[in-house]
UniProtKB/Swiss-Prot annotation:
This is Eukaryotic translation initiation factor 3 subunit K. Gene3D superfamilies: ARM repeat, domain 1, Winged helix-like DNA-binding domain superfamily/Winged helix DNA-binding domain. It comes from Drosophila grimshawi (Hawaiian fruit fly). Residues 46-208 form the PCI domain. Component of the eukaryotic translation initiation factor 3 (eIF-3) complex. The eIF-3 complex interacts with pix. The lineage of its organism: Eukaryota, Metazoa, Ecdysozoa, Arthropoda, Hexapoda. The keyword Protein biosynthesis applies. One of its GO terms (cellular component) is eukaryotic 43S preinitiation complex. One of its GO terms (biological process) is formation of cytoplasmic translation initiation complex. It holds the Pfam family CSN8_PSD8_EIF3K.
Length: 222
């Protein structure tokens, strides 16, 4: 859905154009931006700059604060891990937002993800599933982050453990994630995440520098 922002001169701009000028701080545009946040949740799209602009407008206009939009922005930022979007969003929260119980729950979920305690995350996510059921693709976005961590941590991993880390998924769903990440089966119980050929190999480079090459430079320093 295309969102156009109407300026005082009667002309219209896209949200991206509006965010590039002083109009991003105009509270008259907040409703349009909030609607844009809701569309991101519905359509599995993401615009960090627009979402941060909403939180900034809440800072300048606390009386316009919308907690439901706040929750959506924070949860959407989790879908872009391992990037630091959540930290940036959290830094813009007002004291009354920080004291909110749901905000604290989301912060706890973020902390759990950042320390890679994925089993606990899925347990907490199940308890609080109504909080993000309106966010399309939320679970798969988190699984993408889990896959990233697994890919940088393991060389091989047991299938049962991998299924648990990905949220207790079924075998058929596991197969799709194995294919998506380019992993391979090893026997019945193991998944090969990275081979030795995938590992980055360091190489020492030695360069011989003759005195004649630096003599003139050293003379200038005397």
């Amino acid at each position: 859905m295309s969102h156009l922002v109407k300026m005082e001169n009667g002309q219209s701009q896209t949200i991206q154009e509006m965010l590039g000028c002083i109009e991003r701080y105009n509270p008259d545009h907040l409703k349009i931006l909030e609607s844009y946040v809701q569309d991101q949740a519905k359509n599995n799209s993401y615009d960090l700059e627009a979402n941060l602009a909403v939180l900034k407008l809440y800072q300048f206009n606390p009386h316009m604060l919308n907690f439901d939009i706040t929750y959506t922005i924070l949860l959407k930022s989790l879908t872009n891990l391992p990037h630091t979007d959540f930290v940036m969003a959290k830094c813009l929260l007002l004291p009354q937002q920080m004291k909110d119980e749901n905000v604290q729950t989301i912060i706890d979920l973020a902390d759990i993800l950042e320390r890679a305690d994925f089993t606990l995350f899925w347990q907490r996510a199940e308890v609080n599933r109504t909080m993000f059921r309106h966010i399309a693709g939320f679970h798969d976005s988190i699984r993408k982050f889990v896959s990233h961590v697994v890919g940088t941590t393991f060389q091989t991993i047991k299938k049962d453990l991998l299924k648990e880390l990905l949220g207790g998924i079924e075998d058929s769903t596991l197969e799709s994630w194995i294919k998506r990440n380019g992993w391979k089966h090893q026997g019945h119980d193991l998944v090969v995440v990275a081979t030795q050929d995938d590992k980055i190999k360091t190489k020492n480079i030695t360069e011989k520098i003759e005195f004649e090459n630096v003599g003139a430079l050293m003379a200038q320093c005397l």
